[in-house]
A protein has these predicted regions:
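Membrane-proximal helix-turn-helix segments that form the acceptor-binding/catalytic region
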Residues: 34-35, 156-192, 206
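Short alpha-helical donor nucleotide-sugar binding micro-motif in glycosyltransferases
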Residues: 101, 314, 322-327
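Nucleotide-activated donor-binding/catalytic signature segment of Leloir-type glycosyltransferases, i.e.
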Residues: 284-314
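Aromatic "clamp/platform" in nucleotide-sugar-dependent glycosyltransferases that forms part
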Residues: 335
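Short hydrophobic beta-strand element within catalytic cores of glycosyltransferases
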Residues: 352-355
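Conserved acidic donor-binding segment of nucleotide-sugar-dependent glycosyltransferases
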Residues: 367-368, 372-379, 388-393
């Protein structure tokens, strides 16, 4: 029986591929691994995965298990800036994707995410809308409107040396808006989208009323389907956030909630996955600190939280799971999300969850039954629900 050939175009390699290529294993998009593992078990599908690699001039190809992979060129902006700062394609990128698509000759092109130029380039080079589907992740064409919610205007315009490369917070939102223009073109160029929330359906239908919308929940990382949170084993009065690198993740709201929490629970502690964005103990650290990180640093100082906030450093899948299970409560205070995977992972493990009422969160979590949802710009409600979890232990 002839196999169906599916070509994925992703923003990053799955960990197995990254390990095979001897490049850094990404801690994002881990849910792709579960999806790939499921497809790999099917005898009637041949899976190919293409993804960008910064600065390469030749296609890199290989195989892991039954999965074939190709790395194509992702240009360096100004010679060094990483992918998230890019809004333009490159000559190599288009040539590489054209070659990969021609070689694979896929029956279906499946694009994961719409936020980068390679998504549009792939859809254009394949040029078959009815056999092209886009998996909606975030939607920068809408995200940019919420990028700086809750940050004072003077902070938005504040200058740091890192602004020379990144721009200030207003400019970063504008950059996201420009990436959104590419996204709009991509969604208009395809015949199908896969989503999972009212929010992403509303957004994609606004962009392309003719696109066919298919509902499909995401597979999460394999390890989160086993194990269960237990109150007696958690660090009492500990709070966990899974990301905080950008304003969208809402750390500024969480920090504003901490003083009220500490009034009743002086031993409360906030753990944040990822490197310490406020660290300035070297000349390089002082030069690269962003204006958002400086704002966070000021909030920590203003509320005397220096001993109450810990950045865990980058966490592997297993370490992330361990951190979830140790936590008394998980909080997602984002200014916008579609369906945050971290919230899904916390819910799978049974960790008490609190989330801002943004994007598609209401399609994931039932308020007062599976956790608590609060008004996104109300840190006092974060404090209220955190204390409620601490009181009842669930």
């Amino acid at each position: 029986m002839e196999k169906m050939k599916i070509l994925w175009v992703c923003n990053v390699p799955i960990p197995r591929i990254a390990a095979d290529m001897n490049v850094n294993v990404p801690n994002i998009c881990g849910w792709l691994t579960g999806f790939a593992n499921s497809i790999e078990k099917l005898d009637n599908i041949e899976l190919y995965i293409a993804f960008p690699q910064l600065g390469i001039k030749e296609i890199k190809a290989g195989t892991v298990g039954k999965i074939h992979y190709y790395a194509f060129s992702q240009p360096k902006l100004l010679g060094f800036l990483p992918v998230e700062d890019q809004v333009h394609e490159s000559k190599y990128m288009r040539e590489h994707l054209r070659t990969i698509i021609s070689k694979v000759s896929p029956d279906l092109l499946h694009i994961f995410g719409t936020e980068y130029p390679h998504s549009l380039v792939a859809s254009e080079e394949f040029n078959n809308p009815e056999k092209t589907v886009v998996n909606i992740q975030g939607l920068p064409s809408f995200y940019w409107m919420h990028f700086n919610n809750g940050i004072p205007y003077k902070e938005l315009k504040r200058f740091t040396l890192s602004n020379i490369a990144r721009g200030n917070l207003l400019q970063q939102a504008e950059k996201m808006k420009r990436r959104g223009m590419t996204e709009i073109s991509t969604i208009k160029a395809v015949g199908h989208v896969i989503g999972r929330t009212d929010w992403d359906e509303a957004c994609t239908k606004e962009i392309n009323p003719r696109v066919q919308y298919h509902f499909c929940n995401e597979s999460l990382r394999d390890s989160f389907y086993s194990g269960s949170w237990e109150y007696q084993n958690c660090e009492k009065h500990s709070i966990f956030m899974s990301q905080a690198a950008t304003p969208i993740k809402g750390l500024h709201f969480m920090l504003r909630a901490m003083p009220e929490i500490l009034k009743n629970y002086p031993d409360a502690h906030l753990y944040i996955a990822g490197n310490d964005l406020t660290k300035t103990d070297s000349l390089y650290g002082k030069l690269k600190i962003s204006s958002f990180a400086k704002y966070i640093k000021r909030l920590i100082s203003e509320y005397n939280l220096e001993e109450k906030v810990t950045f865990t450093g980058s966490l592997t899948e297993q370490k992330m799971k361990e951190r979830f299970l140790k936590s008394n409560v998980f909080v997602s205070p984002s200014t916008i999300e579609n369906s945050p995977n971290s919230l899904g992972e916390a819910m799978l493990l049974g960790v008490p969850c609190i989330s801002s009422d943004v994007g598609g969160v209401k399609n994931m979590l039932v308020h007062n039954l599976e956790g608590y949802i609060y008004q996104a710009d109300a840190p006092y409600m974060i404090a209220y629900y955190v204390k409620k979890v601490f009181i009842f232990g669930i």
